[in-house]
Curated annotation (Swiss-Prot):
Disordered as annotated region, ranges: 604-627, 1322-1352
This protein's UniProt keywords: Cytoplasm, Cytoskeleton, Microtubule, Repeat, WD repeat
Role: May modify the assembly dynamics of microtubules, such that microtubules are slightly longer, but more dynamic.
Family: Belongs to the WD repeat EMAP family.
Designated name of the protein: Echinoderm microtubule-associated protein-like 6
Cellular component terms (Gene Ontology): cytoplasm; microtubule
Subcellular location: Cytoplasm, Cytoskeleton
UniProt feature, compositional bias: Acidic residues: 615-627
Pfam families associated with the record: Beta-prop_EML, Beta-prop_EML_2, HELP
Listed Basic and acidic residues bias regions: 1322-1337
Top-rank taxon: Eukaryota
Amino acid sequence: MADRTAPRCQLRLEWVYGYRGHQCRNNLYYTAGKEVVYFVAGVGVVYNTREHSQKFFLGHNDDIISLALHPDKTLIATGQVGKEPYICIWNSYNVHTVSILKDVHTHGVACLAFDSDGQHLASVGLDAKNTVCIWDWRKGKLLASATGHSDRIFDISWDPYQPNRMVSCGVKHIKFWTLCGNALTAKRGIFGKTGDLQTILCLACAKEDITYSGALNGDIYVWKGLTLVRTIQGAHSAGIFSLYACEEGFATGGRDGCIRLWDTDFKPITKIDLRETEQGYKGLSIRSVCWKADRLLAGTQDSEIFEVIVRERDKPMLILQGHCEGELWALALHPKKPLAVTGSDDRSVRLWSLADHALIARCNMEEAVRSVSFSPDGSQLALGMKDGSFIVLRVRDMTEVVHIKDRKEVIHEMKFSPDGSYLAVGSNDGPVDVYAVAQRYKKIGECNKSLSFITHIDWSLDSKYLQTNDGAGERLFYKMPSGKPLTSKEEIKGIPWASWTCVRGPEVSGIWPKYTEVIDINSVDANYNSSVLVSGDDFGLVKLFKFPCLKKGAKFRKYVGHSAHVTNVRWSHDFQWVLSTGGADHSVFQWRFIPEAVSNGVLETTPQEGGADSYSEESDSDFSDVPELDSDIEQETQINYDRQVYKEDLPQLKQQSKEKNHAVPFLKREKAPEDSLKLQFIHGYRGYDCRNNLFYTQAGEVVYHIAAVAVVYNRQQHAQRLYLGHDDDILSLTIHPVKDYVATGQVGRDAAVHVWDTQTLKCLSLLKGHHQRGVCALDFSADGKCLVSVGLDDFHSVVFWDWKKGEKIATTRGHKDKIFVVKCNPQHADKLVTVGIKHIKFWQQAGGGFTSKRGSFGSAGKLETMMCVSYGRMEDLVFSGAATGDIFIWKDVLLLKTVKAHDGPVFAMYALDKGFVTGGKDGIVELWDDMFERCLKTYAIKRTALSTSSKGLLLEDNPSIRAITLGHGHILVGTKNGEILEIDKSGPMTLLVQGHMEGEVWGLAAHPLLPICATVSDDKTLRIWELSSQHRMLAVRKLKKGGRCCAFSPDGKALAVGLNDGSFLVVNADTVEDMLSFHHRKEMISDIKFSKDTGKYLAVASHDNFVDIYNVLTSKRVGICKGASSYITHIDWDSRGKLLQVNSGAKEQLFFEAPRGRKHTIRPSEAEKIEWDTWTCVLGPTCEGIWPAHSDVTDVNAANLTKDGSLLATGDDFGFVKLFSYPVKGQHARFKKYVGHSAHVTNVRWLHNDSVLLTVGGADTALMIWTREFVGTQESKLVDSEESDTDAEEDGGYDSDVAREKAIDYTTKIYAVSIREMEGTKPHQQLKEVSMEERPPVSRAAPQPEKLQKNNITKKKKLVEELALDHVFGYRGFDCRNNLHYLNDGADIIFHTAAAGIVQNLSTGSQSFYLEHTDDILCLTVNQHPKYRNVVATSQIGTTPSIHIWDAMTKHTLSMLRCFHTKGVNYINFSATGKLLVSVGVDPEHTITVWRWQEGTKVASRGGHLERIFVVEFRPDSDTQFVSVGVKHMKFWTLAGSALLYKKGVIGSMEAAKMQTMLSVAFGANNLTFTGAINGDVYVWKEHFLIRLVAKAHTGPVFTMYTTLRDGLIVTGGKERPTKEGGAVKLWDQEMKRCRAFQLETGQLVECVRSVCRGKGKILVGTKDGEIIEVGEKSAASNILIDGHMEGEIWGLATHPSKDMFISASNDGTARIWDLADKKLLNKVNLGHAARCAAYSPDGEMVAIGMKNGEFVILLVNTLKVWGKKRDRKSAIQDIRISPDNRFLAVGSSEQTVDFYDLTQGTSLNRIGYCKDIPSFVIQMDFSADSKYIQVSTGAYKRQVHEVPLGKQVTEAMVVEKITWASWTSVLGDEVIGIWPRNADKADVNCACVTHAGLNIVTGDDFGLLKLFDFPCTEKFAKHKRYFGHSAHVTNIRFSSDDKYVVSTGGDDCSVFVWRCL
């Protein structure tokens, strides 16, 4: 058989010719070592100009396109393109990878930048969103990411003087970014009038917020802050591509070929025009500049690098040049000298010196060059062109000899014949033309058999033959020079070839993988001397093969560097070098060849990673010298760990079936049983596909795993403690080096690893999110801080975790085949080794990734499948055990030697202090010294060695050993057969536990009299187990076939076993020897049962659809039951032994009579009365309820009823064991369910006395023993069973407030939608009518009257410059809770309303504000830890809401957390240490998230509940425990690493208690939790069990609770009618046993408290109605601090004409008068209906209020008594006005009318006129100063003027122009056209008001903005200032009488804002 191994020689990259100047910029720098760093293709190059040497970084796998230099000038970051691109940070000294950043960007990484201290790296992606990311690059951790821009970003730069500030620029934009927490927020640069909006190409930041940027037009734009302040015009005459900042100043380079230097203030120093220099040329374009001291670097578009010394700037040196843009295909080497020539689509031919690494000549052609060839004497050079012509040049002076064009298509291949007389030219037309050199290249022959383009040609040594390859994959031969085809095989065989560059033919068939496309290898070249072949392919690889290379799929060595296609490879004339060309990367690589003799079989590992790569994984064919896989290993690799359905699919399946069957009326479901189960003991150990999964704890207990359970086994007591946290098969287990912690990994779609404590069995951390299918190997690092895991995905990913935090540190792809073991290096925490199928790799962590080296075997051994590995005591020594039985000894990555240890694979190895212990398939344990030089002792595992204290029997001698460990003077061994043995060092062995081997277990039978059971499995064994405290296997027998069922006879002496081949046998139950056997059926026997009493009959059911009945005494078949339409699943006898009940796979329930087997049809009602001997069936009305809602997917495999008929146990395909109360009638009965089995529970049986349940688990091979806990014994210890889900019927009642809050939908609010239903064209889109006479500029006419009456003429006209928020009246209580707190020991309070966080000083009443939120704040919490005093967190509504953490005193934002709680965050809370924050969203899943807020990192997140969660709070003494309550929701959470685990509250059997809607939480000592319920009870929990009720703590829902940290007292607040005894606020003792009630004295019928907080002797209370009240604990006196409007939009607003007062009128049915100076409520009146508008009379004595129901009221201001009222309309009054002369009242309504009333006629209020012809509802009205006219704005965006009081419309523009208005509140009209914004299509400007001075107008809109404009405001989109604070809609706005204040009202935020005018 031909040799398929890789060659022993190697290549090493020596030089790269080229620099990537196209489509990149800023990619050329000086390092600290004065070397030049740049990139080309996929290689980072460090070029030392002094020594003319290069170093290479080869860590990328595709084109590098971006590069950044770390501030230390040594570290380099490079980014690449690709589907999953990554960033490498590497050291320019030793070109080692320091960190890898991956898994975030797609498409490519376009820009990179380090910040000034080098800690953070910013990167920009090439994806559609141009994502910007910030990395903590050393950790490989993403800190923040954000959408960059809609178009390309070209450059990014950090501000060196301000941390966390960054600038990016690109197509038509520049953005200024700030990083806060995990939020990256951008503000766009404002170009203004200073410069044109245009594309910015490069940036540099300077001090004092100055940013310099280079623009596409050649200008430098200078920015201060966000604003463009000046431009330096014509800095370059075309686009500026590069801008470099350094100590000396700035350097710029542009498309005009100039470099300009500027000083630190950007004053010009000098200019260097490279086009004008010696090497310059027209069109030279600079892409990158770098300035260091006296030197400059410039990189050009055409791949040159210039170095300029500043003193001699007219003499730039060209230090590097390569081919320009255009594909590079042509390559030829000089036949006699170390020269190479290349030709490219850039139309140049270049001659390179291989010895000097330099370009010696360049010749430009007219056409693209695609092939070149030297004549044999080296004097002539032929070039094949893209246009089908070829040119021959004289090499000496590069002059043309001939130019011939015979073809149209490109010439891709040409070669001179070895004797120099002919030139063969192959074109894409198909033929090869032959030309005679001596006859001036006359064409003398043509080879034309090819049907496709010619790819390769080779001449024979004697120049008589030619072979060709073409695009169709054909290989043809021709006689030369005629071109006659040659077909004789014999003749062809003997031809010696002068060169071999063809990719087809027997000699090179090994270069092709076994199954492949034909075209992906572009070029090969053979080195006959060393018998090696080099190839270049489409994947950027250069490979070395042996030559000839005959068998497909040969091994090779591969070399990376080229990014995409390697277009050509050639040997130099003396075989010293290989040259390769890259198509797209236009680079030429020069590789030094290291022959075998030099490398002498040992691969030197070059410093470059990714270099010297032996035995590539690409082609793992079983080649000559690798033995075939051992059968055990092969079997293991075939196991499939995928599941049809995973446990996490259950909720969805349930949901789907609910939706399908929603028509079914909801009947009362059966109650769950009272009794429960406890898992006591498991027989089994998973050895058949796992290893190293057996350990001693320090306490001497044994840990291992079986099914989904991890077992802690006590040897002394022969008892087990079980960790039940997993929900599927555990596949791997490892123990912590220091503590008794264990990590276990399981099967799963998103496979989890649990780290748990063996003492407490509590989960410490749960690691998820990075493995698919399963976790097959685990290991802790030596210090125990890290954990490494290997997954079962296709790449066998390796993940390195910080397990305590639950964060992944790094990941990488492991190997394409299974990895068996991973081990951490004991000395170096960042090094690992993995072994697996034909695999050993040594890994080094680098940031978020790993770099790896394969084990290098050299001549000491061959590549083997490795089964185990250990580090030695000495540094760098590694020992691995192979499938051959050898131990391989490694130093670093080199194999030193091998030692024969076992026959067959070495499956297990364990390192000791002074040696090793190994175990193999041969069943022998061997003790070795520390270098595997001597075997000190061997132990063979044999039956004879078993001690008497063994708990079972060995199935066979020398079982295969899968796990081994030492400790406590013993060797612990786990076998493939499922046995765990303990070997004493002196020799005796004790069997501790055992179970079935690989194969499904279905057969299970309990002995009728004794605590014994039998099991039978597909592993072809029958086993008998003792179930008393001994728990051991009594007997075992091997069977010829596997079995699926067994049964004891009624006296227990005989045991019947049904086998899978259709036979069955009856054995003696004691000796397990045959009594009789039959083989009557072909398909498997599925059930077997003896009839009752004497056991006269035996019924045998099979998959042949029959049940056979045998007479036991006569041993004859007496009857056959026919009639089932499918296979039989279960059978049961009745108690008389006459009737058989049968279940079939078609869900039939049938009855047959013994002995003949006659079929009976029995009505269900009758069947229920029959007494059955056993019940194992799953069908029929009495067990209808055991089928789950989604049972079309899952099946119930088994059921069994207790003897007393009360309890039915079932086992199903989800691994659940369930208990039901029998009979189980009606659908979907409730149950208790238990986990432990992994996927399927195949059988369940009660022991003869019903005290124990036995279950077997199918493929998990486990036999589990559960004890039944009766109701009586349960009270003492509550048991967790996963209860079935609770239902709606159980909620604790209904409350209107809770119902409202449940139904609140925040999404409608997020989007700014118009609050009024307007129609028509917006004002700024209407066409303007030109007024009749546009007045001439100078006119004799009288001056135009003022637009607006000036009220305060006496004062100087005052322009309002700014607004500042001064006070807010409002508190959001209606849908929030616990959002009101004391600060500074009760001196201040903090709360929120609208989008403002408010701090109010109680002594002065003054307020300060936090206004960074963009929409309604929904929650607020204060950090209680003294270290974080006054730290507040708030969050809001929004599609991607942010949580802001800020300092309450300075209002400085400390951190911002961008959340993915879509819709909004409705509760937040700090942990005990103040470092963590938990948030819960109003998204559909109600996600709960835990944050480390200072770092801005998300720790963990998980869906909380399907309905609203109201509160989530940390325990006051914990950072890991918290509680959430909500709609029928009560969960106790633990933060385990980065996972959230919860336990539901267990209510148990407490009488009055129901799981109901919970609204609030408080905490007590000793793990007590109090929760307030909707019905007014408080539930008291200990851990997660309910222990008592505080009945009716309040009469209504308990909305809020507060735990005082200093004394533990608890305050509750609820909804309650004030009575003598009760109150809505109560103060309780620590146990909530005694309380004191407080009245709030608000005068309301029902007080509803939403927030309480306790300070020093005071209780702070917030109510649903927006009041904030302080209650004295001693005096019980209450003091109202804030009395805002209640829920409802506020539309009515009017300011007093002369005093600092205003009135607001709201939909809450009240009107309130406020004092502007003292900021307090003066008076309020209840109107009984929603109010919509208000107006003062000009004398300020009366106020008119319009109502939503069409009524209006006039009140006297002083007393708020009604003066008069009237209702002439039935729909809302929108605006109301009293005329300046106090005569008329105008009332505008939704009925498109304005009514006029005469006030002088007294309180009768008769209507004296009205306006009709109004096109839509009225919005605003203004009277003229003389009370003769009124202007009306309408919902159709039309403004009309009417006469008063007749209502006639005024249409003459002339008249309208001359009116002076008393006030202006209209948003319509030419005077205010400028207030309408561009983006108003969905939202409107709602209100406006002009100052009394007439110089400003302020507006409020649907975006929640206040805007201040100049008045009049006649230009569209006028300039303005904007103010935030309101949330969505500003409904009304007014200036106070003296223009000192602006008052604005909010729609949804029910708040009144007062702004000071500055």
